[in-house]
From Swiss-Prot:
Disulfide-bond pairs as recorded: none
PROSITE patterns: UVRD_HELICASE_ATP_BIND, UVRD_HELICASE_CTER
Source taxon at top rank: Bacteria
Domain UvrD-like helicase C-terminal: 505-805
Cell membrane listed as a keyword: no
Gene3D superfamilies, sorted: 3.90.320.10, P-loop containing nucleotide triphosphate hydrolases
CDD domains: SF1_C_UvrD (cd18807)
Domain UvrD-like helicase ATP-binding: 12-485
Protein name: ATP-dependent helicase/nuclease subunit A
Amino acid sequence: MIENWPKKPEGSQWTDDQWKAVVANGRDILVAAAAGSGKTAVLVERIIKKIINEENPVDVDRLLVVTFTNAAAQEMKNRIGEALEKVLIDEPGSQHIRKQLSLLNKASISTIHSFCLQVIRGYYYMLDVDPRFRIANQTENELLKEEVLDDILEEEYGIEDNTIFFELVDRYTSDRSDDDLQRMILALHTESRAHPNPEKWLDKLVEAYDVEGKTIEDLVYASYLLEDVKFQLETAEQHIRKATELAMLPDGPAPRVETLQADLALLGTLSSAARESWTSVYEAMQNVSWQTLKRIKKSDYNEDVVKQVDSLRNKAKDEVKKLQEELFSRKPESFLRDFQDMHPVLEKLVQLVKVFTERFQAMKRDKGMVDFTDLEHFCLQILSEQSEEGEMKPSAVALQYRNKFAEVLVDEYQDTNFVQESIIKFVTKDSESEGNLFMVGDVKQSIYRFRLAEPGLFLGKYKRFTQEGLGGGMKIDLAKNFRSRHEVLAGTNFIFKQIMGEEVGEIDYDADAELKLGASYPEGEDVAAELLCIQQTEEEVIDGEEGAEVEKAQLEARLMAQRIKAMVDSGYEVYDRKTDSMRPVQYRDFVILLRSMPWAPQIMEELKLQGIPVYADLATGYFEATEVNIMMNVFRVIDNPMQDIPLAAVLRSPIVGLNDEELATLRAHGKKGSFYEVMSSFLKGAPLEEEKELHDKLEWFYNLLQGWREFARQQSLSDLIWKVYGETGYYDFVGGLPAGKQRQANLRVLYDRARQYEATSFRGLFRFLRFIERILERGDDMGTARALGEQEDVVRIMTIHKSKGLEFPVVFVAGLGRRFNTQDLMKRFLLHKDFGFGSQFIDPRKRIKYTTLSQLAIKRKMKMELIAEEMRVLYVALTRAKEKLILIGTVKDATKEMEKWLDAREHSEWLLPDHIRAGASCYLDWIAPSLYRHRDSEILLELGQGSVPDEIYGYDTSWKVEVVDGNTLLAPEPVQEEKQELLEALREKKAVPLESERKEEVYDRLMWKYGYEEATSHRAKQSVTEIKRNYQSEEGSDNAFIKKLRAPIRTRPRFMEKKGLTYAERGTAVHAVMQHVDLKKPITEEVIREQIAGMVNKELLTFEQAEEIAIEKVISFFDSDLGKRVLAAKSVEREVPFTMMLAAEEAYQDWQGQSGESILVQGVIDCMIEEEDGITLIDFKTDTIEGKFPGGFEQAKPILEERYKVQLSLYAKALEKSLQHPVKEKCLYFFDGNHVVKIEE
């Protein structure tokens, strides 16, 4: 088989390993593709080669290609399509290639969920599911779960003598709520659904607690923890050995060697016991006795060495003490009793989970909806059936798919879960040695365990498969990196060769795993990788842990801002592959990677202060926006006005506008009862004179509130929201505030959220509020509108997870001193795919609780998995850099941290000791000890001591390591020494002597006159309407300009709101109709009225505006000669916005400034028609003519011509500039009297 593989073509750019991955077949193949190794290109080439194979061509729809995201699937299709089109250019007559191009859109190139959906749609009749099902919204799913679970628990509470249930409640709930019990049920449900057979997994979980007739040695938890015992005892032994070496130095405390050797013997005894059984270790631990150190005269020995010896011995003793207290302070039988006692309670818990799953599935079925886990399980249900032994085997449908697919290719295989693996297994051949499964991925980049991805699947096959593929599957390593410079790759290798191993890290970073240089770059300057370790300021700016975090973010942000500015200003060069040359670095070339985003806003702020454009996709802040917060409180009050805090917030908001004094006055009217009750009581009585204004405000709001509450019971939620916006005027109000457009956009998003909610199976305001609460509980807050886009020349800030698959010339990895998130390990109960359920033993009667064996084992296992995941996250971060890698971390006490990192200094092997790697609490705890052993780390070497093996010390990589004093970063800019004296004089308000050498400087400053003063009295940006007014009056003067700077009143005062529309509002309504009326429909009263109603429904007009429209005047326009020309025109454009530059002297008739100054002019053209002989410009006017001018229209015409001449001339100029065609005619149309005025130059 191997001999038949095509040979690599002469001059091919594929490496040998890549070519092997393209052509190898005949068995299951696992490709371990390192970062930047071109795995996607290999995958596409393999598919193309299969399609165009001359001897055995495969149709593209006979391949199943599974990708991690929809975007990746689309990119794969595009690449395959482009490759096939290239083949077609060489073989234009190939019907086979043409067929493949036509089949491509139908090909199974998709995510696993899309494939599942395809299977379910095809075989829905094998399931109890409506074929018209829809995919549930995540929040809707959460609300359904809550509803089902509430019903189940309510039933359980109502059952008499439900002893075990109440035992469960007593153990796992508080006296305030049963939230913890609900969380346990939901967590067990979720975890079970990550397994092919959820019920079987749940049953095994209960079986593990059935210890009848078992000893502690029979428990999987004890077996695993014994491995941990060995690990900790080995760590203790290493400490004692190191202490012994130091004691035997010429100036070491030699008399203590005898005691240290006795310690080693003791630890040896414990280790031997750990290799035998739990009981053996327990018995040995009861007999632990440490000898007392011999007293010595410390002045006879090196004091530092003595301290180190004592410290190392104490560390060893602490390791043993920790084991004694956690694991061996109790007899083995007592651990077994815990399991016996907890077994019936756990059995009841699992029963509740099964009932919940059954009812939840039934409710989704009734509502015709499925979620993503359902897609996987339904697909698996179709593809599998149960054998006589009770095991899952391929169904007839699965066998059909096996016959259909010539090969199944899985991208990002390291992120597959157990259910997905089963689906893939059922549509591929049974035998790995003769299989047709091709898997590509990099387990070192598996960073989605929180989504239940299982890297162990990849690891298992990687260990099982061989490079030759003899007797099983084949593995191929793609280690060449075509992305990064040597300095980036060597720097990454140097760290990971020391920290990633099978025991701690889950995979050996061996020669096969190392990154190998595949890219060629020109020689560059300052390309060494860097570690910048910031020493936090001695006195924190803000007290407390949160304040310290804020300061760390600020320190790192300032350092990064300095480096970015310096690199940009100095013209630091990066390589441009498109031009094959070096070019100056741009802001877009930088990225700042963070483990999570809490620091991002502060980093953005610091960079902006330095004038650095920056972009971050902040998916937070929406619900914190003031306008959204206020509206949410309004809806909470509509739902339940008895809530004091939301009601007070609304009363205090601009909607009602009470001040603190008025709020206090209201509360004084009723010190008991809710705010709503007090408000209702206050409104029933007659107000005092001084309380009348308060009474009016509250009465207005109270009446609105009652109307809203009634409306909410009968109408849709989205209609309610828009009604509140309109009746309060709040939507218009926020539009007049700073960032008004964004605020209005935020309110529209809330309306859209309501529409989305109403598309689910839920209805009503109360449920909507719960819907939003669920979104916030999940941390799914949305980001507010963005000021910068992703394609602009900006520095980007993103999480390491978001950066996966991307690359950047210069990468900052920040926050390396932040502690790992271990909150999951602190939960009251723990779940694990292999070890099941673990929690404290709780006895509510005796009011005691203590740690159980299962909890200890699961916690230890989860910690080791977390450590391995964090290593992989760090690997992803470091491998994003193409040319320059800069690592930044902040520590509170650099000297103290250095002492801790010093443990690694003299370790003789590449891989650091397990206890150092497993004991890391942040990324710096891996990076710094590794760099401690490199020749370029002078700053670290000065603080440490000892020697490093030559192979490690002289490793071929370049590093710059620097410890930065945080005080220098937070200090203000230094004031020049020569100015100090002058500053002191100014502070003391001393006059400058007449004979002073500074006399001329002071005089020049006092007499200075701004050279562009004239320009400051005129706007740099004007609307056409404002320019028109400038020509008509003195509004262009300084005073008028200053008055214009005052914020305009966007809405009328409340006392005017019910007195009809103003002239301006009527004009706006008429213009809206003229903009949106459908010119293709008949212009009749009935049709126009119908269209106006449609505009109201679309919220283009309000009811009040619609009622004020004089439909007969609209019809009159279209009956006029000008209106008929509009209907007959070649093309009609309405409400055409424009912006153009205009000479200042054209815009301002009083301009006296420098010539050459330009003004930005903007406006909107009502209507523009194109006829055979040119363009005509039309402006609609609603001015009052009849009755205002005694001489009628003839008297008004010259006045109107003069009034609007400038405006239409500017419109014409703008159109001529943009269209490059002359405007033949400029017309004004006045609805009052149906008059047309033509404007002549």
